[in-house]
């Protein structure tokens, strides 16, 4: 098994960046929550994606899933799992310096303030939003999901995760 490329991030707090490659959690990369970014994060580039595959262990016999994120996503990694980064790079989420935008995934209380937000679509039916209570396997932990046909108002609790795809804007509104 070939281990991926590790390098120091030029961004926040000397975070380690894990490039495309193969990583056994607990051996090659520490367990925890990670942000996975596309190579092109300029201007919230909607056509740039990152792709990872996560396996239950390093035998690759039990695939948890293949995930593709627009701009960036968040995922929890546990000891013994096997992560394959095909496209993009990963960095510890607490050191990733994520700021709210119109695409990607955000944790309330760390990347954005908890509260009520209005999400407006880029164009009718072009995007979606989802709320998760955990980012270990995504769909098992989804609280809410909707396509964006018109502006919607969502309440985001501390610790919840908001995923946006092709939103035109997001703004905080009074609770």
Predicted regions: what is each one?
Residues 1-16, 40-100, 123-175:
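Primarily secretory-pathway and cell-envelope proteins
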Residues 27, 32, 38-39, 43-46:
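Secreted/periplasmic proteins that engage bacterial cell-wall peptidoglycan
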């Amino acid at each position: 098994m070939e281990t991926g490329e590790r390098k120091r991030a030029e961004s926040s707090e000397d975070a380690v960046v894990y490039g495309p490659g193969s990583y056994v959690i607990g051996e090659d990369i520490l367990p925890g929550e990670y942000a996975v970014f596309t190579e092109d994060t300029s201007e919230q580039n909607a056509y740039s994606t990152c792709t990872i595959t996560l396996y239950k262990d390093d035998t690759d016999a039990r695939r948890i899933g293949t995930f593709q994120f627009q701009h960036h996503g968040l995922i929890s990694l546990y000891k013994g799992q096997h992560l394959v980064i095909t496209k993009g790079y990963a960095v510890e989420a607490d050191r990733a310096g994520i700021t709210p935008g119109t695409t990607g995934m955000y944790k309330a209380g760390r990347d954005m303030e908890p509260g009520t937000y209005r999400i407006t679509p880029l164009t009718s039916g072009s995007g979606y939003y989802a709320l998760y209570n955990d980012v270990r396997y995504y769909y098992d932990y989804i609280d809410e999901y909707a396509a964006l046909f018109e502006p919607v108002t969502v309440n985001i609790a501390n610790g919840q995760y908001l995923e946006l795809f092709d939103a035109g804007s997001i703004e905080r509104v009074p609770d």
